[in-house]
Each structure stands twice: as C-alpha cells, then as structure tokens.
Curated annotation (Swiss-Prot):
Pathway: Amino-acid biosynthesis; L-leucine biosynthesis; L-leucine from 3-methyl-2-oxobutanoate: step 2/4
Keyword entries, A-Z: 4Fe-4S, Amino-acid biosynthesis, Branched-chain amino acid biosynthesis, Iron, Iron-sulfur, Leucine biosynthesis, Lyase, Metal-binding
Coiled-coil ranges (or none): none
Catalysed transformations (reactions): (2R,3S)-3-isopropylmalate = (2S)-2-isopropylmalate
Top-level taxon of the source organism: Bacteria
UniProt protein name: 3-isopropylmalate dehydratase large subunit
GO MF annotation: an example: 4 iron, 4 sulfur cluster binding
Broad enzyme group: lyase
Subunit and interaction comment: Heterodimer of LeuC and LeuD.
Cofactor note: Binds 1 [4Fe-4S] cluster per subunit.
HAMAP family named among the record's database cross-references: LeuC_type1
Length: 470
C-alpha cells in the first residue's frame, strides 16, 4: 500500500535524482529565475571554471532590484547599480539566457514576471537567489530562495543538494471581514506565532478561505512564508490556478495543457497524510493589521495599542520591544491609529500585482492624498502597468496626487533611488520592516494596499474600512 503523502513530499520526491547513504538528496531544478544582484558572482564562477550553463533554456532573467522606477534610465542608477545591470546584460547574452531587460514589455520584479509569463507551473522545482522565492509556491511549485554559490551550482548542473523539510499545515477557516486581505492574514499569523515558528518547515496553506482566493492573493500569502521562518510556502493547485496559467507564454498549449491539468490535479496532499505540525485559524476574527516595530512579528490590529513591556515575560522580547520603539519613535501602550505618515509605498513582490492596485484605486478614486504625504504607486511588472493603464487606474492615482511609476522593486529595499530619509515614516505594502530597510534611519509600517491607500488620504495610520462603508 502506498504511503499517504503531503503536497510538499510529492513534489520533493518526484525531483530526487540521487540520494546516497547518509547524504543529502540531490534535486533536479526545473526553473531558475535570476536578477542583477545575486547573479554576477555566479556567472563569474562559471567563466573561471570554463563551464557552460546546463540548461540556459530553463533560466529566466530580469532587472528589478536596482532599476530606477522614475525613468527606467540606466544613467539614473548609481554606479554600482549600473554595473550590476550591465553585467547581467552581458552575461545573459554570452550564456544565451532570456533577459527581460530595460524597455522589455515583460520586465518586472522576478516573483511577478515568473508567474505572469507561465514560467512558474504547478509541481515544478523553482529557485532564485532571492529570499521571497516562496511566492511561487502559490501554484503548487516547490520554490525556495538560494545563495549565490547555489545559483552557480544550478547554472552548472541544474541540480541542488537539499535536506527534506518538515511539513506544517496551516488551515484557514471562515471568510475575511470587509477591508481585510491576505496581507493582514500573514501579518496576523507572524504576530501570533513569531518569525521563527516556521523554521525548518515547508508550509502548506489550505482550508475554506484558501480555495476561494485569487492567485494574486495566494501569492501574497506564500511570499511572506519566509517572514514566518519557513523556507517554503505552498498551496495545492486547482481550477483557479489552471485558469490563471492558461494561454501564458511559457505554459503548455492545446491538448498538452489538458494533459498537464490532469497531472496537476494529483498535486494535493493525500487523505491521511501526516504533517509534523499544524495550525488552524479562524480568519473571520482578523482585523486590518499594522506593524509598529522593526521585525514582522511586531504587528497589531488597527484598533489595538502597542504592547507594554509587562506583556512579555521573556527578557529578549522585552529588549526587542524597547529597542524597536526607540528606533521608530513610538511609546508603549500607544494607539497606532493616528500616527503621522510621510510616505506611502504601494508595490513590491508582495503587493505589486493588478489586484493590489485595483484595491488601492478603489479607495483613492475621487479623493486626494494628504498634502504632507508623498505616495509612490509602483506596478510589479510592465505587464501589470499596461493592464492598470488599460483600466484607467493610472489616472485615478495621478488625479489623487500619487506618483505613477515604472516596474521594479523600488522602495521595498534601499538599493535603488527610491529611499526614505532618516526619520521619515513609510506606510508600506512590502514585506520587511527592518532597521533602515527603506533607507538609512527610515521607519516602516507594513500593511495591506487598502490600508496604505487610506493612510495616503489621511496622512496618518488609519482604518481602511471607513472608506469601504464598514
């Protein structure tokens, strides 16, 4: 009798090409995404060893981290950024890798362009030299971030040694309140259990809520599995997945697509499959979530107060709270609603998709942003930008007083020309609120696109639900 397997175990086991005694299994890698920041050293390693790429056709490159979203002009980038971008252009040409370069209609953030081109498919193994590669697990892919030396190894061999992870099931019951989204769900989850709860695990999100989510919403959830401590976040593919993939450039076509769908339907955890850990959440109780500190677990509901030191028994947690509040210039027991905001950033691989922009536009339509707020709307890809413009979303944003940008990582990280100044407070739809993440001395408050749009209007942290008739 065949042993019942989880989704993760099925995909992992199907890709083991060799497993020696007392050795880590070697996995075949189906898809490799690369960008300008973590690929130069890997290409250099290949050149020094006089190697070619094993499967350049299974590699897709894009320019995203360093690019200026103001102009897409290479000359607008810093010297280091310019060098990284031109190096990627040269390397992809030399090794025969498809590059979504500056001016390409499909250029964008690596974790957005992969799915929208059909490069990401259910049941594949997919890696990238970026920690948020778990995003692609929303398709039932086994996707994880790797280091630069591993990037080189995949280029050379199309394989990787990987220890098998433990499995965790997170079942989401119920439905969201109006004004609550998957960004709020993942922030709530991290706040409840901490940033280390998922360490050593491959997470599978399932349940009533998950089945009803769009692919965009599923990607937001899997994207931040890494902030929960997990290496992998997965969702079993279904008809919503298949419909999203159908017709995309790299997706199977015609009868072949139907054959793949039959296989993809088998990519779900078997009845009776054993997980090493499980969590069950009633999502109907979740309210819009806002981060107040300097790690993604320091999060509260919009109507809650910042914790007091007495709320924590652990000395390290107490110190973490005090250090965070000192940095962000907030107080214990302070109400988060009403805290002044300087910049609003709507974008990133977490929330830079068309659905995210629609949510923000619904709130901003017919309204003006606060006179003291600078608001950046940065589509995650040029395809998202075009689709948004076809719907007239760009006009809504511009009329509201926002800056409508080109595609890129932008203010998610202080690596390009979109940075906050020291002491400036950013309402951000990105995934990390570390010290200086958005610029030296910058202060980040993580939230959903709806909450960020509401903050842009009021100039303070506020409840988005007042703009949704709640």
């Amino acid at each position: 009798m065949t042993m019942a397997k989880t989704l993760y175990e099925k995909v992992f086991d199907a890709h083991v090409v060799y497993e020696g005694k007392n050795e880590l299994p070697i996995l075949y890698i189906d898809r490799h995404l690369i960008h300008e920041v973590t690929s130069p050293q890997a290409f250099s390693g290949l050149k020094m060893a006089k190697r070619r790429m094993a499967r350049a056709d299974l590699t897709l490159a894009t320019i995203d981290h360093d690019v200026s979203t103001k102009s897409m002009d290479l000359n607008a980038c810093s010297d280091m950024a310019k060098e990284q971008i031109t190096t990627l252009m040269q390397n992809t040409k030399e090794f025969g890798v498809r590059l979504l370069g500056l001016g390409d209609k499909n250029q964008g953030i690596v974790h957005i362009v992969g799915p929208e081109l059909g490069f990401t498919l259910p049941g594949v193994t997919l890696v990238c030299g970026d920690s948020h590669t778990a995003t692609h697990g929303a398709f039932g892919a086994l996707a994880f971030g790797i280091g630069t030396s591993e990037v080189e190894h995949v280029m050379a061999t199309q394989t990787l040694k990987q220890a098998k992870l433990k499995t965790m099931k997170i079942e989401c019951k119920g439905q969201f309140q109006k004004g609550v989204y998957t960004k709020d769900l993942i922030l709530y989850l991290i706040a409840q259990y901490g940033t280390a709860k998922g360490t050593g695990y491959a997470i599978e999100f399932c349940g009533e809520l998950i089945r009803n989510l769009s692919m965009e919403a599923r990607m937001t959830l899997c994207n931040m599995a890494i902030e929960f401590g997990a290496k992998v976040g997965m969702i079993a593919p279904d008809e919503i997945t298949f419909e999203y993939i159908k017709g995309k450039e790299f997706a199977p076509k015609g009868e072949e697509f139907q054959k793949y769908c039959e296989y993809w339907k088998s990519l779900r955890s078997d009845e009776g499959a054993k997980y090493d850990a499980s969590i069950t959440l009633d999502v109907s109780k979740i309210k819009p979530q806002i981060s107040y500190g300097t790690n993604p677990s320091q999060v509260i509901g919009i109507d809650e107060k910042i914790p007091k030191i007495s709320d924590f028994k652990n000395q390290s947690e107490q110190k973490s709270l005090l250090d965070a509040l000192y940095y962000v210039n907030l107080e214990q027991d302070q109400v988060i609603e009403g805290v002044k905001i300087d910049i609003v950033f709507i974008g990133s691989c977490t929330n830079g998709r068309l659905e995210d922009l629609k949510i923000a536009a619904d709130i901003l339509k017919g309204r003006k942003i606060h006179k003291n707020v600078k608001a950046l709307i940065v589509p995650g890809s040029m395809q998202v930008r075009k689709e948004a413009e076809n719907l007239g979303l760009d006009k809504i944003f511009i009329e509201a007083g926002c800056e409508w940008r080109y595609a890129g990582c932008s203010m998610c990280l202080g690596m390009n020309d979109d940075k906050a100044n020291s002491g400036q407070r950013v309402a951000s739809t990105s995934n990390r609120n570390f010290v200086g993440r958005q610029g030296k001395g910058s202060i980040t408050h993580l939230m959903s696109p709806a909450s960020a749009a509401a903050c842009a209007i009021e100039g303070v942290i506020c409840d988005n639900r007042k703009y949704l008739g709640v």
